[in-house]
From Swiss-Prot:
Biological pathway: Amino-acid biosynthesis; L-histidine biosynthesis; L-histidine from 5-phospho-alpha-D-ribose 1-diphosphate: step 5/9
Assigned keywords, A-Z: Amino-acid biosynthesis, Cytoplasm, Histidine biosynthesis, Lyase
Pfam families, per database record: His_biosynth
Active site: 12, 131
Assembly and oligomerization: Heterodimer of HisH and HisF.
Keyword Cell division recorded: no
Alphabetical list of InterPro entries matching this protein: Aldolase_TIM, His_biosynth, HisF, IGPS_HisA/HisF, RibuloseP-bd_barrel
Protein name: Imidazole glycerol phosphate synthase subunit HisF
BP GO annotations: L-histidine biosynthetic process
Gene name for this UniProt entry: hisF
Organism (species): Methanospirillum hungatei JF-1 (strain ATCC 27890 / DSM 864 / NBRC 100397 / JF-1)
Function, as annotated: IGPS catalyzes the conversion of PRFAR and glutamine to IGP, AICAR and glutamate. The HisF subunit catalyzes the cyclization activity that produces IGP and AICAR from PRFAR using the ammonia provided by the HisH subunit.
Length: 271
């Protein structure tokens, strides 16, 4: 797909504040998403994702304020996800200054939202986030994928932050999302998320090979080499990470230098 691979930090935001801790030195306010996003911008991020995990609809206005401030200060694409349930939500988010919206549970519950958003605002604005879990028992119509230990499994789409099974095959859903107008897939494996043991390569490569739109790998980064594996073996077009960047374990500039030396085409980091 894309010629250059992208590195994308993700910020979880609740009531307008970043909820995962950071240890960046020199930040006036480690809880301010715009300040953090600007720091990532300086480090050479290709995009930034804001994931709004605000529980109540009443506080949704706070993310709009954050988006507006970020759009004024950032010079890189901004994707916003979380709580986007209707076409009106999509419109408000884009009007506030987001370049793309990420829809997850709402897309599974109402697949027409993908088509409606793509038709209204363009496929380039629509990212369908897919959370998956491994299932080892074969079922009719499910795509079994070989695993490194010689076993195999199929991957089920899960919603509501990974808590709700759907019975939907991940590869079939990715294809449907593309057919309905998704411009990108943001794939997170619940098997690897938070483990720092690397991306879930089997499903990342399977979906990357099954669709013609970019796939963003998410969940499990712990080392520089995990980014490399996601691109080379997972065939992902972009890699998303959170904690390794937030806690200062590595910088985006360092990741890009490493990948460049390994022959991966990336957008050069410029101060």
């Amino acid at each position: 797909m894309t010629l250059t691979r992208r590195i994308i930090p993700c910020l979880d935001i609740k009531d307008g504040r970043v909820v995962k801790g950071t240890n960046f030195l020199g930040l006036r306010d480690a809880g301010d998403p715009v300040e953090l996003a600007c720091r990532y911008n300086e480090q050479g991020a290709d995009e930034v994702v804001f994931l709004d995990i605000t529980a109540s609809r009443e506080n949704r206005g706070m993310i709009i304020d954050v988006i507006q401030r970020a759009a004024d200060e950032l010079f890189l694409p901004l994707t916003v996800g979380g709580g986007i349930r209707t076409l009106d939500d999509v419109q408000k988010t884009l009007r506030a200054g987001a370049d793309k919206v990420s829809i997850n549970t709402s897309a599974v519950q109402n697949p027409a939202l993908i088509s409606e958003a793509a038709q209204a605002f363009g496929t380039q604005c629509v990212v369908v986030a897919i959370d998956v879990k491994r299932r080892t028992s074969p079922e009719p119509g499910k795509t079994m994928i070989p695993l490194p230990d010689q076993s195999s499994c199929w991957y089920e789409v899960v919603t509501h932050g990974g808590s709700q099974p759907t019975g939907i095959d991940a590869i079939a859903w990715a294809k449907e999302a593309e057919n309905r107008g998704a411009g990108e897939i943001l794939l997170t494996s619940m098997e690897t998320d938070g483990t720092k043991e690397g991306f879930d390569i089997p499903i990342t490569s399977a979906i990357s090979e099954s669709v013609g739109i970019p796939v963003i790998a998410s969940g499990g980064v712990g080392t520089f080499d995990h980014f490399y594996e996601g691109f080379v073996y997972g065939k992902a077009d972009a890699a998303l990470a959170a904690s390794v960047f937030h806690y200062g374990e590595m910088t985006i500039a360092d990741v890009k230098d490493y990948l460049s030396k390994k022959g991966i085409a990336i957008r050069p980091h410029t101060q």
